[in-house]
Regions:
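A non-catalytic alpha/beta surface segment that caps or lines the substrate-entry region
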Residues: 1-42
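Active-site metal-coordination/substrate-binding segment of hydrolases
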Residues: 37-123, 135
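Acidic/histidine-rich catalytic neighborhood of metal-dependent amide-processing enzymes
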Residues: 98-181, 188
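Zn-dependent metallopeptidase/amidohydrolase metal-coordination segment
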Residues: 187-232
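His/Asp/Glu-rich mid-to-C-terminal helical/loop segments that flank catalytic regions of hydrolases
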Residues: 216-274, 280
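Short, cysteine/histidine-rich loop/knuckle motifs that typically chelate Zn2+
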Residues: 277-278, 296-297
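Cys/His-rich microdomains that often coordinate metals
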Residues: 280-283, 302
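Short linker/helix segments within small regulatory modules
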Residues: 285-294
């Protein structure tokens, strides 16, 4: 499936495809198992978006024409079903006034592309989950349903992070693992939750969430930079091949002094954060330039006055 298809397909239709094409499936999770099963990387992404009919009843109404600004800049548009996509072919951006959902359909595209283009002996496991946006039910199901298969994995890599170069560690992974991931061109950043927060600790493996090119997630201003998406896919391809060759099981060793939340609590200073006064969402101060000082949850403007003291 190409990225346009994944950004426009209804979740129920995607589920029907995954039930037929995956090796094993549950109610909210779908696992692709490689032919060679030992010492493999597992890729993770989630199929649900905040724009699913079941999770967002006030979905924006479909629009059928470009704005005057879009027309004047010669942007391309395509309509699939009830969804309008606007493409900036020069910049490689995709946007939708109906809600884009690149969080995390861009990740789904990335992991499926890697699955289909990396031959053995390097073919990864791929785990696709549902309901990440509402608490991670698919991830909880996966750790029970695929316990035997996922125990073979050396690490977990999720493609579900905004931006271009971020690598996020949720479980206080040790510095050696973080340095290894960064050697492929990523830069450590802070995040709060993704499916690997649930999955990796169950198997005592290190895990990372990588940027996949979307911005302003969970808002009507979300867009996808497809060039950055493809760069992450290329970097991840190199990472998978190298990690499979090394066949090292990256066992999780909690390091409370690293970014994130370890057994002894957070090591972040309050002054590293900004909290939205409207909805309470918490942000890392260094991300403000990228976010244009706008809350991605409620779109309120953020201010240095909201920095913890």
């Amino acid at each position: 499936m190409n990225i346009t298809h994944l950004l426009t397909i209804q979740k129920d239709d995607l589920i029907d495809i995954l039930k037929l094409s995956s090796t094993k499936s549950g109610s909210h999770s779908y696992l692709f198992v490689p032919e060679v099963k030992e010492n493999k990387v597992c890729l993770v992404a989630h199929i649900d978006t905040v724009w699913d009919e079941s999770t967002l009843p006030n979905k924006p109404k479909a629009q059928s024409t470009l704005s005057k600004k879009a027309q004047s800049t010669s942007l391309k548009q395509s309509t699939v079903g009830n969804k309008l996509l606007i493409h900036d072919t020069k910049k490689g951006f995709i946007y939708s006034p109906n809600g884009l959902g690149a969080d995390d359909r861009a990740g789904v595209y990335g992991v499926l592309k890697l699955l289909s283009t990396i031959p053995e002996p390097n073919t990864p496991y791929v785990l696709l989950t549902d309901l990440e946006e509402s608490g991670g039910a698919g991830a909880y199901e996966a750790v029970d349903l695929y316990k035997e298969e996922l125990a073979n994995c050396t690490m977990f890599i999720e493609l579900d992070r905004r931006g271009a170069n971020d690598c996020v560690f949720y479980n206080s992974e040790h510095g050696e693992f973080a340095s290894y991931i960064e050697s492929f061109g990523f830069v450590e950043a802070m995040g709060s939750f993704s499916d690997i927060s649930i999955i990796a600790p169950e198997f005592e493996r290190c895990a990372v969430n990588l940027s996949i090119g979307y911005y302003n997630e969970h808002t009507s201003k979300e867009y996808l930079n497809t060039n950055e998406m493809e760069v992450t896919i290329a970097r991840t391809r190199k990472l998978i091949k190298d990690a499979t060759k090394k066949a090292k099981h990256w066992e999780h060793i909690s390091t409370p002094t690293r970014w994130g939340y370890g057994a002894e609590g957070s090591v972040w200073s309050d002054k590293d954060f900004i909290d939205c006064t409207e909805c309470g969402e918490l942000y890392f101060l260094d991300d403000m330039e990228l976010l244009q000082w706008t809350c991605t949850k409620c779109e309120a403007k953020l201010s240095l006055l909201n920095v913890g003291i």
